[in-house]
Amino acid sequence: MKSYEVNFDGLVGPTHNYGGLSYGNVASQSNSQQASNPREAARQGLAKMKALADMGFKQGVLAPQERPDVAALRRLGFSGSDAEVIQRAAREAMPLLVASCSASSMWVANAATVSPSADTADGRVHFTAANLNCKYHRSIEHPTTSRVLGAMFNDEKYFAHHAALPAVAQFGDEGAANHTRFCRAYGEAGVEFFVYGRSAFDSRYPAPQKYPARQTLEASQAVARLHGLSDDGVVYAQQNPAVIDQGVFHNDVISVGNGEVLFYHEDAFLETDAVLGQLRAKLASKGGNFQAICVPRAAVAVEDAVRSYLFNSQLLSREDGSMLLVVPEECRNNERVWAYLGQLTSQGGPVKEVKVFDLKQSMQNGGGPACLRLRVALKEAELAAVNQGVIMTATLYDTLLQWVDRHYRDRLGEADLADPQLLVECRTALDELTQILKLGSVYPFQRQP
């Protein structure tokens, strides 16, 4: 039976704005309070989805969240009608309103961790929604994320869904942004690679000094247990605390893996040789031939990697076995990074081509191509069991473009978030979207009695 890696990209929501909410994310902080263009952001994301689908890659869509999150504001003590809640929050606590309007769910690499059926004890695809406990604006996402994933992957014969881990710092979980899977073929048993920033319960592990380590070892271990993964198919690695302090807030900002290949920066991990040795040995035991592509700091400094998002790229396998690297425009604009990519594709390794996309609206908030997608490895029968309304086609692309143009503003500043009409616009758009994507009632406003 054939198997595929399907990329489900987050559709940018109507409240996309530059709130500067993500401490430790350099781009998010440096573009704080600029005016955003939600319509352009959504169109840029859709263009990438359509281009990859046209190239023969399996592509799906993950719906955005209801924003502003009025229920979250009510839990913080704001009362009255929905409009009154928004206006009172704007007057009394603007940072809370900004957080409740965040469109950060577009970065679906943080939506969940996914283990394919070939790796799990019960032979089903397992999903654990990420609690995103480190940042308030993201910690409110997982209930809706779970409902959306449940509506997309709704056949219990093939799919198992787990609630987010306990919402405390000790189990801080950032989802697939700190998880990669290596395999010979997508449908065969592989090795799941969990990267953490610190240990919650063992003080012997080093930790960053400036920025928070968002993922704990204990969270990664809990997800592996929930998914029924065997020890011979799991490797844990600690991310280098020094690069977290340089703005590498998730591992997908300093490495990317696919198939048998890990593309990583020289400074990405602690005890790199031991980590690579484990990956090589465990993948070999499953018939695979692990290949590591190390980018030396002499060629690309960590600062350049963070600024260009070289590693927040998509490493995709073509039918002929070669690989394509999907990078943001910022890589072409960085002389050193672009020179390195020229060498990479000409030196005879697995990466044969680099494809550049303009994702500026997302990039200015600190999210590149890899942030925007959740990878799900599926066998043919499993893919057939996915809700087909979320699979990208030419028709769906056209429908979503028209939907965006109807409902999205082309400019959004902080003052606009206080406009109660924005909530009405968002709910109207999402109500229509659930019909387009055949999701049912996944949003809180659709579920109110």
From Swiss-Prot:
Pfam assignment, any one: AstB
Pathway: Amino-acid degradation; L-arginine degradation via AST pathway; L-glutamate and succinate from L-arginine: step 2/5
Annotated substrate binding sites: 19-28, 110, 137-138, 214, 252, 365
GO BP: any one term: arginine catabolic process to glutamate
Compositional bias per record (Low complexity), positions renumbered to this chain: 27-37
Region (Disordered): 23-43
EC top class named in words: hydrolase
Keyword Cell membrane (UniProt): no
Quaternary assembly: Homodimer.
Matches recorded under HAMAP family: AstB
Family recorded in the similarity comment: Belongs to the succinylarginine dihydrolase family.
NCBIfam families assigned to the protein according to its UniProt record, in alphabetical order: arg_catab_astB, PRK13281.1
Protein name, per record: N-succinylarginine dihydrolase
Species assigned in the record: Pseudomonas putida (strain ATCC 47054 / DSM 6125 / CFBP 8728 / NCIMB 11950 / KT2440)
